[in-house]
């Protein structure tokens, strides 16, 4: 195959465009050899003989003659000084240097290739033309802006002003490397001495000298050139390169030009500087102090003085015995590796782009026969690096100046675990020597994310601060400050936890009657009512769409009373807490009594819902004594519930399960009663558990007739059962709270018992009659109700929710005398007033919430005498509480009571002295409302019966724990929205807020009188 030279000889026109004729001439080399060996005259004679012109300038001739170094005369040569013509003057280019390369011990920023962007160059001239700043001012500005490193390469440096800026930068912790021409170094040294500065003793400045190439003659004589490069590299991001030398004359006299370079081209200057630094040497004037600094070891890079520095290929290989036996090879600990010049990788560089996917083309074995060292990961990293600093792995060096023997003993390296700076090669020095074997591997993406979070203050810490250890502790703390990424994750995690804990949409009420969190915020915030109500309405819609898992309770229409049972016990018309005697076991009942056939036999331990509240202690005698002063002390209830009853806990777990099953009843806030802290330890959502609790004993007939009040009925009955209850309840706590309706329900006739058994049959005739019953009740809308409809405008969501509310027909109202204990007038009750009847039932439904235990305990005798004992005929109106026509989804649970209504009303306001004793028909009226049909217009009815005292109203809830108030964050009991503001039923947090309750009582009396 023909070569290019053969083709060129055949056809002279076939030459490459890049071909350049060689300019080398042999007589050039011979003339230089004669000049070195014989001087200037022999050199000129040779040019005449060869008939060539002079090619050297006089300055060059003088430089060669001045700097030539001749070899010593050898005995092998003859006495006539004749030279052997066979000797060659060719230059020797070794593959490896036999001199170790120095380390960048002050640190060097690592710039990932390709991240600097496009190259941008600005030209500056001296004297300045279009720029405001001169070249010298620009140099000073760049030095002031340096934050990491200043790398200066200069032929001659004698400018005092620039030198002062460099020294000041070193005091800020900026690493300063200065490379000067060896032939002009003496000028720099003289300048520093005149300024009174020993530059070799400055902790953050390294000054070294660089000389040009060596020219070797045929006889072995040689001379070297100068280092004429001039550039300033700042933070490996900006370069000033040009003809400007750091001398006074260049500022005032000489013309010069420089380039300000940024971008990708800076990487070339970065590599060039590290190449020059690798071939630099310590000046002879500094050699004595340098040798004293490293006298305790073989070399700086071998004895660990340049701590944590990744040794370059030349420096490590030059200090090893390639073919000798390695001593201490069995000691594979960190101290051995460190002392032998083997250091861990930079923690960032282990995951950088340079490390991944790079396979060295040549991996020499510098360990000889030592196979163990061959497989050390630190060793492998050092083998594939190129010579010195020209493109090898970034160097790792300490930021604390621990490279002095004195400071190294006082400041041993610590294990710094914080990830190093992303822009510093030497950043891993802050982490101490971390072994490769126990460092967990991390992804490069994680490392890159950590680099981005490094702030400027932390980046500045990549340079040494001081010799002492004061700033060591400060940096130790700074490096452990939480990063933005970790802080954000922690904040989001805490926010999710707090959001979950503060979400009370599914929460059950706690012991004080309010949802979790109501005690802490918004006591008097009416906005919470609307917000929570709207939320409940959305829950209502979901309950309409999704069928409840728990079957609805069967409904049966009472043929005798014309009403039907409701599945929502929480909205019973006349359900009100009864008064509680002073004995701790006043309302206890037997737990071993047989259950009715229609009642499923479920354990009582699983009845109560689980709440975010403390449990009632086993003995409540102390709590009862605190409320015997005649007024309510509701704040004490929180501190009374400290004990935990296992039975109560099991009871709550079952109730929570029932609550979750029945999605149409998120919370049943209105279905709580019997607030006495000593007598009622559980409360039950009667919608789910009314058929599961055991019925109380039937009260004696003579007791019902002779008793003057409902309170006496229950009180006497409880006294009869006190001994049996104590025997069955060894803890002495209340396990059941008996309501008047429950007591009278046992006294029903046989016909009513059969009627109660029909409630479990869904296909009963009474179940089918319910629709027609509602229609008749709707048609019986009286003018009074229509009149009140326009007066009382309830919110939209109240009207939406009360779609199933029904009215009571006129004929039914004739059979239901109305109960109004607080009315002052003695006029006969209006038997046909459907509005008063409807509103009275609404109020009594609202009063299903609790009464202060203190006022029940301290009920006066005249209050007990206020209500005559009901006759046996009343029992037919007191069927199991609840109306079937009531909304099955408990829509008026939206009524979120205001927090100020939580505390109970004081007892003196609860007993009006001027009210006459109502007749037996009035009492029947209160119980007949349990059997009435609910109306959607009830929210607009008069509130004439809203002022009746709750102490006389029966309580149909069973197994309910003490609840301090009726105001919960989410009130899911069925009641009228107008009665939401009836503070006479609920405790308020502030005692003076009972004035509002008194006002409502007076307002109700006024309305009733007008009728």
Curated annotation (Swiss-Prot):
<feature type="modified residue" description="Phosphoserine">
    <location>
        <position position="869"/>
    </location>
</feature>
<feature type="modified residue" description="Phosphoserine">
    <location>
        <position position="424"/>
    </location>
</feature>
<dbReference type="GO" id="GO:0036313">
    <property type="term" value="F:phosphatidylinositol 3-kinase catalytic subunit binding"/>
</dbReference>
<comment type="similarity">
    <text>Belongs to the FAM83 family.</text>
</comment>
<dbReference type="GO" id="GO:0036312">
    <property type="term" value="F:phosphatidylinositol 3-kinase regulatory subunit binding"/>
</dbReference>
<feature type="region of interest" description="Required for interaction with RAF1 and for the function">
    <location>
        <begin position="1"/>
        <end position="284"/>
    </location>
</feature>
<feature type="modified residue" description="Phosphoserine">
    <location>
        <position position="334"/>
    </location>
</feature>
<feature type="region of interest" description="DUF1669">
    <location>
        <begin position="1"/>
        <end position="283"/>
    </location>
</feature>
<dbReference type="GO" id="GO:0005154">
    <property type="term" value="F:epidermal growth factor receptor binding"/>
</dbReference>
<feature type="region of interest" description="Disordered">
    <location>
        <begin position="691"/>
        <end position="738"/>
    </location>
</feature>
<dbReference type="GO" id="GO:0005829">
    <property type="term" value="C:cytosol"/>
</dbReference>
<feature type="region of interest" description="Disordered">
    <location>
        <begin position="750"/>
        <end position="769"/>
    </location>
</feature>
<dbReference type="GO" id="GO:0007165">
    <property type="term" value="P:signal transduction"/>
</dbReference>
<dbReference type="InterPro" id="IPR050944">
    <property type="entry name" value="FAM83"/>
</dbReference>
<dbReference type="GO" id="GO:0016020">
    <property type="term" value="C:membrane"/>
</dbReference>
<feature type="region of interest" description="Disordered">
    <location>
        <begin position="807"/>
        <end position="928"/>
    </location>
</feature>
<feature type="region of interest" description="Disordered">
    <location>
        <begin position="555"/>
        <end position="585"/>
    </location>
</feature>
<dbReference type="Pfam" id="PF07894">
    <property type="entry name" value="SACK1"/>
</dbReference>
<feature type="compositionally biased region" description="Low complexity">
    <location>
        <begin position="913"/>
        <end position="923"/>
    </location>
</feature>
<keyword id="KW-0963">Cytoplasm</keyword>
<protein>
    <recommendedName>
        <fullName>Protein FAM83B</fullName>
    </recommendedName>
</protein>
<dbReference type="GO" id="GO:0019901">
    <property type="term" value="F:protein kinase binding"/>
</dbReference>
<feature type="modified residue" description="Phosphoserine">
    <location>
        <position position="466"/>
    </location>
</feature>
<feature type="compositionally biased region" description="Basic and acidic residues">
    <location>
        <begin position="750"/>
        <end position="762"/>
    </location>
</feature>
<keyword id="KW-0597">Phosphoprotein</keyword>
<feature type="modified residue" description="Phosphoserine">
    <location>
        <position position="852"/>
    </location>
</feature>
<comment type="function">
    <text>Probable proto-oncogene that functions in the epidermal growth factor receptor/EGFR signaling pathway. Activates both the EGFR itself and downstream RAS/MAPK and PI3K/AKT/TOR signaling cascades.</text>
</comment>
<feature type="modified residue" description="Phosphoserine">
    <location>
        <position position="915"/>
    </location>
</feature>
<feature type="modified residue" description="Phosphothreonine">
    <location>
        <position position="782"/>
    </location>
</feature>
<dbReference type="GO" id="GO:0045742">
    <property type="term" value="P:positive regulation of epidermal growth factor receptor signaling pathway"/>
</dbReference>
<keyword id="KW-0472">Membrane</keyword>
<feature type="compositionally biased region" description="Low complexity">
    <location>
        <begin position="557"/>
        <end position="574"/>
    </location>
</feature>
<feature type="compositionally biased region" description="Basic and acidic residues">
    <location>
        <begin position="694"/>
        <end position="705"/>
    </location>
</feature>
<feature type="modified residue" description="Phosphoserine">
    <location>
        <position position="422"/>
    </location>
</feature>
<feature type="compositionally biased region" description="Basic and acidic residues">
    <location>
        <begin position="813"/>
        <end position="828"/>
    </location>
</feature>
<dbReference type="GO" id="GO:0005737">
    <property type="term" value="C:cytoplasm"/>
</dbReference>
<comment type="subunit">
    <text>Interacts with EGFR; positively regulates EGFR inducing its autophosphorylation in absence of stimulation by EGF. Interacts with RAF1; displaces 14-3-3 proteins from RAF1 and activates RAF1 within the RAS/MAPK signaling cascade. Interacts with AKT1, PIK3CA and PIK3R1; activates the PI3K/AKT signaling cascade. Directly interacts (via DUF1669) with casein kinase isoforms CSNK1A1, CSNK1A1L, CSNK1D and CSNK1E.</text>
</comment>
<dbReference type="InterPro" id="IPR012461">
    <property type="entry name" value="SACK1"/>
</dbReference>
<keyword id="KW-0656">Proto-oncogene</keyword>
<feature type="compositionally biased region" description="Polar residues">
    <location>
        <begin position="727"/>
        <end position="738"/>
    </location>
</feature>
<dbReference type="GO" id="GO:0008283">
    <property type="term" value="P:cell population proliferation"/>
</dbReference>
<feature type="modified residue" description="Phosphoserine">
    <location>
        <position position="664"/>
    </location>
</feature>
């Amino acid at each position: 195959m023909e070569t290019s030279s053969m083709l060129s000889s055949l056809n002279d026109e076939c030459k490459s465009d890049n071909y350049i004729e060689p300019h080398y001439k042999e007589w050039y080399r011979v003339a230089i050899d004669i000049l070195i060996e014989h001087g200037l005259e022999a050199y000129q004679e040779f040019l005449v003989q060869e008939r060539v012109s002079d090619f050297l300038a006089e300055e060059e001739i003088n430089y060669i003659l001045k700097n030539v170094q001749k070899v010593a005369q050898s005995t092998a040569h003859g006495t006539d000084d004749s030279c052997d013509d066979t000797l060659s003057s060719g230059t020797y280019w070794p593959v490896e240097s036999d001199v170790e390369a120095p380390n960048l011990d002050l640190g060097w920023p690592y710039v990932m290739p390709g991240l600097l962007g496009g190259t941008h160059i600005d030209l500056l001239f001296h004297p300045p033309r279009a720029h405001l700043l001169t070249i010298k001012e620009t140099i000073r500005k760049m030095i002031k802006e340096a934050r990491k490193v200043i790398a200066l390469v200069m032929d001659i440096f004698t400018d005092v002003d620039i030198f002062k800026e460099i020294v000041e930068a070193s005091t800020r912790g900026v690493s300063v490397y200065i490379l000067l021409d060896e032939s002009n170094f003496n000028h720099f040294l003289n300048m520093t001495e005149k300024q009174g500065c020993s530059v070799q003793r400055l902790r953050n400045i390294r000054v070294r000298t660089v000389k040009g190439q060596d020219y070797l003659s045929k006889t072995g004589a040689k001379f070297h050139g100068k280092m004429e490069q001039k550039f300033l590299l700042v933070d490996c991001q900006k370069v000033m390169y040009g003809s400007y030398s750091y001398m006074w004359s260049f500022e005032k006299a000489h013309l010069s030009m420089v380039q300000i370079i940024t971008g990708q081209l800076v990487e070339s200057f970065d590599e060039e500087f590290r190449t020059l630094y690798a071939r630099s040497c310590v000046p002879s004037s500094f050699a004595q102090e340098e040798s004293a600094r490293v006298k305790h070891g073989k070399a700086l890079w071998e004895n660990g003085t340049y701590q944590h520095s990744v040794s370059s290929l030349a420096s490590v290989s030059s200090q090893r015995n390639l073919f000798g036996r390695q001593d201490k090879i069995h000691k594979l600990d960190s101290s051995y590796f460190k002392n032998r010049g083997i250091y861990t990788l930079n923690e960032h560089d282990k995951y950088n782009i340079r490390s991944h996917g790079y396979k060295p083309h040549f991996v020499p074995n510098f360990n000889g026969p030592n196979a163990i060292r061959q497989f050390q990961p630190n060793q492998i990293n050092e083998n594939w690096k190129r010579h010195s600093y020209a493109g090898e792995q970034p160097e790792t060096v300490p930021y604390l100046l621990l490279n002095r023997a004195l400071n190294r003993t006082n400041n041993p390296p610590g294990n710094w675990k914080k990830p190093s700076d992303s822009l510093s090669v030497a950043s891993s020095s802050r982490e101490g020597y971390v072994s490769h074997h126990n460092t967990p591997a991390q992804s490069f993406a994680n490392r890159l994310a950590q680099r981005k979070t490094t702030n400027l203050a932390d980046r500045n810490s990549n340079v040494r601060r001081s010799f002492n250890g004061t700033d060591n502790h400060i940096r130790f703390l700074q490096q452990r400050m939480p990063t933005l990424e970790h802080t954000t994750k922690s904040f989001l995690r805490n926010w999710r936890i707090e959001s979950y804990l503060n979400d009370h949409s599914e929460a059950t009420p706690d012991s004080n009657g309010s949802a979790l969190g109501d005690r802490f915020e918004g006591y008097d915030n009416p906005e919470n009512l609307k917000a929570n109500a709207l939320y409940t309405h959305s829950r209502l819609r979901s309950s309409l769409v999704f069928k409840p898992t728990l079957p609805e309770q069967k409904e049966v229409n009472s043929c005798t009373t014309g009403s039907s049972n409701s599945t929502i016990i929480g909205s019973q018309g006349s359900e009100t807490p009864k008064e509680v005697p002073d004995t701790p076991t006043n309302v206890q009942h037997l737990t071993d009594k047989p259950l009715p056939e229609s009642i499923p036999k479920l354990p009582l331990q699983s009845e109560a819902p689980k709440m975010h509240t403390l449990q009632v202690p086993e003995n409540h005698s102390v709590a009862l004594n605190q409320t015997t002063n005649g007024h309510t002390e509701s704040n004490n209830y929180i501190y009374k519930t400290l004990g935990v009853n296992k039975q109560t806990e099991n009871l709550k777990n079952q109730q929570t399960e029932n609550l979750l099953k029945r999605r149409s009843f998120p919370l049943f806030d209105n279905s709580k009663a019997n607030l006495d802290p000593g007598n009622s330890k559980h409360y039950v959502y009667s919608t789910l558990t009314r058929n599961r609790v055991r019925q109380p004993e039937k009260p004696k007939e003579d007791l019902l007739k002779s008793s003057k009040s409902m309170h006496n009925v229950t009180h006497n009955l409880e006294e009869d059962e006190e001994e049996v209850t104590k025997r069955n309840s060894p803890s002495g706590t209340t396990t059941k709270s008996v309501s008047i309706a429950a007591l009278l329900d046992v006294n029903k006739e046989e016909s009513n018992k059969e009627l109660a058994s029909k409630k479990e049959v869904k296909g009963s005739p009474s179940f089918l009659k319910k629709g027609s019953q509602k229609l008749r009740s709707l048609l019986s809308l009286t003018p009074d109700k229509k009149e009140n409809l326009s007066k009382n405008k309830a919110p939209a969501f109240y009207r939406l929710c009360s779609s199933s509310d029904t009215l009571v027909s006129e004929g039914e109202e004739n059979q239901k005398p109305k109960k109004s204990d607080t009315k002052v007038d003695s006029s006969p009750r209006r038997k046909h007033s459907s509005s008063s009847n409807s509103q009275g039932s609404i109020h009594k439904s609202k009063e299903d919430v609790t009464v202060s235990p203190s006022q029940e305990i301290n009920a006066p005798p005249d209050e007990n005498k206020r209500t005559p004992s009901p006759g046996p005929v009343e029992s037919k109106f007191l069927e199991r509480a609840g109306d079937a026509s009531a909304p099955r989804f408990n829509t008026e649970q939206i009524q979120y009571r205001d927090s100020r209504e939580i505390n109970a009303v004081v007892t003196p306001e609860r007993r009006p002295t001027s009210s006459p004793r109502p007749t037996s028909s009035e009492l029947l009226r209160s119980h007949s409302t349990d059997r009435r049909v609910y109306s959607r217009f009830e929210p607009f009815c008069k509130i004439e019966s809203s002022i009746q005292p709750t102490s006389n109203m029966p309580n149909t809830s069973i197994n309910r724990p003490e609840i301090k108030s009726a105001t919960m964050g989410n009130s899911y009991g069925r009641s009228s929205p107008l009665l939401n503001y009836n503070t006479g039923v609920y405790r308020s947090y502030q005692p003076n807020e009972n004035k509002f309750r008194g006002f409502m009582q007076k307002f109700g009396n006024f309305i009733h009188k007008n009728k």
